[in-house]
């Protein structure tokens, strides 16, 4: 036996041993994250895009800007830590996201992305859901190379997959100011929503075919209440915009039906529907009871009448106490709001997350 062959065998055995130890000692499931800027952990840092958050004051309570579109942690960060993780799920495009690190999960989310490939064009580069699934397929092969088909299948069966998408398909596609005026005249909301659902059905089915079994699907929040939408229509006054919320709820109703359909048709799957619209709407309507002082004005914004239209950046002013604001910037919640949302998704009843919550999902044994 040559020295080279011997060394190669040692390396292979070491990798297999390490992988088995890593899996055997795993107390929490791997975490695979798909979605948009609500859960992006820094993938857009590596893209030529206007949708970036890797500059101050973003991440002010994180220690430094990471590419997260908030002052601190995202919902998936909080959920994964609550399940017992000491680490946060790394972004797919980061050069360090490789080797045994991927056995704990990967974040594929991209700011500005959506279900439809036409969504987010105005930002430049973004990784829409189809491309995120392509990236997961690559990770899947890497994991199989590390630990083999059988162990990889076990890992994927126990892993938590979350998909947080759809908001940009409305905000930055169907309801894009000025640009989408003609589209809304010729495409009825019902038709657009049906297009989203049809595409999403294919995407979630593909995720299942790639090995995912425990899948959390987050609906669209009350986008008519975000500072950007309020500021874009002065006639709304202090009210949320009705039409974006109505279309979001039209989509959400069909999404819940889709989740029930997939649970019925895809053997061994457990899809869970997270009603973030209901949770965030409750926070906004009852903000003071949650300890917030502002549910309309973003913590990070430019001074002036249109401050709620401009993304958070170096020229922005930051509120003194981030824990008192529901919104960090014109689009995204603060960490304080994210904590409330995450807790209700983790442990809420069926009015918040259906048919089971994330803690129950994590403990669920799936053999198929």
Curated annotation (Swiss-Prot):
Transmembrane segments: none
Signal sequence range: 1-24
EC number: 3.1.1.-
Active site feature: 37 (nucleophile), 329, 332
GO cellular component term, pick one: extracellular region
Glycosylation sites: 117, 286
Alphabetic keyword roster: Glycoprotein, Hydrolase, Lipid degradation, Lipid metabolism, Secreted, Signal
Keyword Hydrolase attributed: yes
Pfam families named in the record: Lipase_GDSL (PF00657)
InterPro entries assigned to the protein according to its UniProt record, in alphabetical order: GDSL (IPR001087), GDSL_esterase/lipase (IPR051238), SGNH_hydro_sf (IPR036514), SGNH_plant_lipase-like (IPR035669)
Classification via CDD domains: SGNH_plant_lipase_like (cd01837)
Any GO MF annotation of the entry: hydrolase activity, acting on ester bonds
Localization, UniProt: Secreted
Major localization listed first in the record, in broad terms: secreted
Gene Ontology biological-process entries: lipid catabolic process
Family: Belongs to the 'GDSL' lipolytic enzyme family.
Full protein name: GDSL esterase/lipase At4g16230
């Amino acid at each position: 036996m040559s020295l080279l062959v011997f060394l190669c065998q040692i390396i292979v055995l070491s990798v297999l041993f390490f992988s088995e130890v890593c899996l055997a000692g795993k107390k929490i499931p791997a975490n695979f994250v798909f979605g948009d800027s609500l859960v992006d952990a820094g993938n857009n840092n590596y893209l030529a895009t206007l949708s970036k958050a890797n500059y101050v004051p973003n991440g002010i309570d994180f220690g430094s800007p990471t590419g997260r579109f908030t002052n601190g942690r995202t919902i998936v960060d909080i959920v994964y830590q609550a399940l017992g993780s000491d680490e946060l799920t790394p972004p797919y495009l980061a050069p360090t996201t490789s080797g045994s690190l991927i056995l704990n999960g990967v974040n594929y989310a991209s700011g500005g992305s959506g279900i439809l490939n036409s969504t987010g064009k105005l930002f430049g580069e973004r990784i829409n859901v189809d491309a995120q699934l392509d990236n997961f397929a690559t990770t899947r092969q890497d994991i199989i190379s590390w630990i083999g088909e059988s162990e990889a299948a076990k890992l994927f069966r126990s892993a938590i997959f979350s998909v947080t998408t759809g908001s940009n398909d409305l905000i930055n596609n169907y309801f894009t100011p000025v640009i989408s005026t003609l589209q809304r005249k010729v495409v009825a909301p019902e038709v657009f929503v049906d297009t989203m659902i049809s595409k999403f059905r294919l995407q979630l089915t593909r995720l299942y075919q790639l090995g995912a079994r425990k899948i959390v699907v987050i609906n669209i929040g009350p986008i008519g209440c975000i500072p950007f939408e309020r500021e874009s229509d002065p006639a709304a006054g202090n009210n949320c915009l009705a039409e974006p919320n109505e279309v979001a709820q039209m989509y959400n109703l069909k999404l819940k039906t889709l989740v029930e359909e997939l649970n019925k048709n895809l053997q061994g799957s457990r899809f869970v529907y997270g009603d973030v619209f209901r949770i965030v709407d409750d926070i906004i309507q009852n903000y003071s009871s949650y300890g917030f002082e502002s549910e309309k004005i973003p913590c990070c914004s430019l001074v002036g009448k249109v401050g709620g239209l401009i993304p958070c950046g170096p020229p922005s002013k930051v509120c003194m106490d981030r824990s008192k604001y529901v919104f960090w910037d014109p689009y995204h919640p603060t960490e304080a709001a994210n904590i409330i949302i995450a807790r209700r998704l983790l442990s809420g009843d069926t009015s918040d997350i259906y048919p089971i919550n994330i803690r129950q999902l994590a403990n669920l044994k799936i053999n198929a």
